[in-house]
């Protein structure tokens, strides 16, 4: 191998950071390159039935016989052009195709003749490195972003004790709970004594009570005009309202 194009050495294991193993699949690079097979069809493979080999050869012979007319007079006459077909070859092709997909007793579908009629292998799920709890269960509400904070704080939902969860079915909301609290507004900064102090100064060097006295005229409440809304009625349709 050319180390420039293939830096991986033969027989080196595959990169498997999650240590997932699949039955029947190799876990490392092959030790040697596979032998060159000049044939297009792997006839020596057990999954390639002999019927398929005969079917391929018979079909190729049929195409070669249909390629050119056998007599030269058919080209000059006008009308329907009939290709000469070997009846025996067509019959053999049909027999080969029916033998390749023959019906095996006891199975509801057709199987190749090389496949055994035994019980299927037991179900083995693929190893999943992720836990099931990472994927939320579907609900009637759209999935919200787990890290997005809306205009309201949600009431924390706590799980019950393990023995209660074990013997009961606990259904918790996948989205915002019914009890919501408005987000608290940060209080305005107070005019404390420490506000006027600079790093490296003392209390005697600060302005003291001068910064604590109000320096401006208090502004009254701003009048807000509330529009008149229509009376609450029964809607003609029902839908799930968004949470925010």
Swiss-Prot record:
Signal peptide: none annotated. Residues 107-126 are annotated as: Disordered. Transmembrane segments: none annotated. The keyword Acetylation applies. Disulfide bonds: none annotated. One of its GO terms (biological process) is positive regulation of base-excision repair. The keyword Membrane does not apply. Keywords: Acetylation, Methylation. The modification Asymmetric dimethylarginine is found at residue 102. The modification N-acetylmethionine is found at residue 1. It is linked to Associated with cisplatin (DDP)-resistance and radioresistance in the treatment of lung cancer as well as oral squamous cell carcinoma and poor clinical outcome in patients. In cancer context, protects cells from induced-DNA damage and apoptosis. Acts, at least in part, through PI3K/AKT/NFKB signaling pathway and by preventing POLB degradation. Decreases POLB ubiquitation and stabilizes its protein levels. Belongs to the FAM168 family. Interacts with POLB. Interacts with AKT1 and MT1X. May interact with FAM168B. This is Protein FAM168A. It comes from Homo sapiens (Human).
